[in-house]
């Protein structure tokens, strides 16, 4: 009989780095991140760190991926800032969600944890964010409204509240 463990099954990146909307599938045993320089390996790893540790400190992010003129920060990831100085979301207000789906291999239950952000085009720091967790798998489509927009902080709170009314009542959001 194998021992129960918690494994990442999926990851959702909405408006993070150069990614508009992506759901990554993880293998239970081995996951290899490979690609050319600038392809997004560190972008994914930094998102995992931000979710798990909740730190927005630039010193916490992957320093090895920085070069002298491009210092990574959570705000620069949210804006989708590129090495050439452009930004995918630099001149608009937008929302972002990064989340991990975790399976308990013993009970085959799922829990999702993540952070939702709201960023205004003139923000110089992160002001509006919500840490959240809920039971069950990620919603479909992953934290995106029927209109195709990333969930806002209020959308996340409503979703988490709905999940907290479910049979297992395991959900939470905090600002």
Q: What spans do the regions from the language model cover?
A:
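Conserved small/polar residues in nucleotide/adenosyl-binding loops
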Residues: 174-175
